[in-house]
């Protein structure tokens, strides 16, 4: 009996020790992995939010799953499964994601994806010189992937949408004049063009237009991981309120923002009627206004 009591006390003591404390594990995909600037930002956001909440929630670890990027629909399927491959994914918000997963309505890129430049064929530049309004832009053919958040928005707004079945084929289709332009985030378009310069020397960035399309970029959490959702919400809130997120944004994308010279462009606003009522548009400090912001934090 005495030996049993000693064993019981030993077990209780060890279970209460830090070695046995709960560890929150985030499972995410390679689209969040630090293999380029854009994906490094996603990874750092997750890691910083977890680090900031250690005093309240304890230890954590991040496990990256899979061998490469995964289509968004498959990522959502895994997010919804019990013990699926992912329990956290960062993507532009879409109604299906908000309905089925747990959205954390804090725009982790502070609306940077709201601003879109147009990748086009050099032979089309004269056409864009005549575009000054949404009405004159609508008839032109826009190339999109159906999985993108912009697809549903632009369809609803009456754009002439042409579907591309993969990310890479978008550029070859544009080169063959299958459509007139691809709208890309201002932090995406320069690297995309640079990496394809040899393959598609006729592709250029249209120099005079910027589309403004509200596109919040959220962290989505599995409905089977409510504690992770609570922890990330707390961490992201601290990052936003303390200016950490804004500083991180400029560290990663400041060079692209300077190169964009967005203030010299004609602006075309596009409504996003797919946004939910929970979108924090009233929290002005959650969003970066590139028309009225300095290029330093």
Task: Label every model-predicted segment.
Residues 32, 112-117, 121-124, 198-230, ...:
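Periplasmic-binding protein-like
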Residues 35-51, 118-158, 170, 187:
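Bilobed "Venus flytrap"/periplasmic-binding protein-like clamshell domains
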């Amino acid at each position: 009996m005495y030996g049993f009591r000693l064993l019981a006390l030993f077990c209780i003591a060890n279970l209460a020790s830090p070695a046995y404390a709960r560890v929150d594990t985030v499972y995410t995909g390679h689209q969040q992995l630090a293999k380029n600037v854009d994906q490094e930002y996603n990874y750092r956001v997750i890691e910083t939010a977890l680090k900031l909440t250690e005093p309240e929630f304890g230890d954590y670890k991040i496990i990256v799953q899979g061998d490469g990027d995964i289509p968004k629909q498959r990522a959502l399927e895994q997010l919804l499964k019990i013990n699926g491959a992912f329990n956290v994914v960062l993507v532009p918000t879409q109604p299906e994601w908000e309905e089925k997963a747990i959205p954390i309505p804090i725009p982790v890129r502070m609306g940077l994806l709201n601003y879109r430049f147009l990748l086009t064929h050099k032979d089309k530049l004269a056409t864009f010189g005549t575009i000054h309004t949404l009405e004159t832009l609508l008839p032109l053919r826009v190339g999109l992937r159906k999985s993108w958040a912009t697809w549903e928005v632009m369809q609803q707004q009456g754009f002439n949408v042409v579907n591309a079945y993969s990310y890479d084929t978008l550029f070859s289709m544009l080169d063959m004049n299958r459509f007139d332009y691809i709208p890309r985030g201002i932090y995406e378009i320069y690297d995309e063009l640079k990496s394809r310069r040899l393959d598609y020397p006729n592709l250029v960035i249209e120099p005079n237009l910027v589309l403004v399309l509200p596109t919040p970029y959220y962290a989505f959490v599995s409905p089977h991981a409510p504690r992770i959702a609570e922890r990330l919400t707390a961490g992201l809130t601290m990052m936003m309120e303390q200016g950490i997120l804004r500083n991180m944004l400029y560290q990663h994308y400041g060079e692209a923002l300077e190169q964009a010279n967005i203030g010299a462009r004609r602006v075309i606003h596009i409504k996003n009627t797919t946004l939910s009522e929970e979108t924090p548009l009233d929290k002005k400090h959650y969003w970066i206004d590139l028309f009225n912001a300095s290029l330093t934090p």
